[in-house]
C-alpha cells in the first residue's frame, strides 16, 4: 500500500478539526498552525481513522451524510486526478487546500439540505 494511502481520510478529518467539528482533544494547535500535514495529524491524533467519539454532533452528522459521497468525488479534485490512483495523492497542505474546496461545497450543500 502506498505511503499516502490514508491521505483522503486525513484531508477529511483535518477539515472537520479546522472547522470546529472535532472534539478539542482531536484538534491540536499543530494542525491549526500547519506544523503537521493532515496525514500526520490522522496518524498521531486519530489512529488513522475517523471515530464518532472524535467528533462533535455536527461533525458526526455531516460525516454520516457526506463521507461516502466525498470518497466518490475525491478522485475528481484536480490535484488528485493527476495520479493513477487516489492512494498516490501527496499528503501536503497544497493538496488539502484543493480538497478543502470540495469538502466546503459538500458542507454547504448539506447545510442547505437540512435547513441550516
Task: Tell what function each PLM region has.
Residues 104-116:
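Glycine-rich, aromatic-bearing surface loops/beta-hairpins
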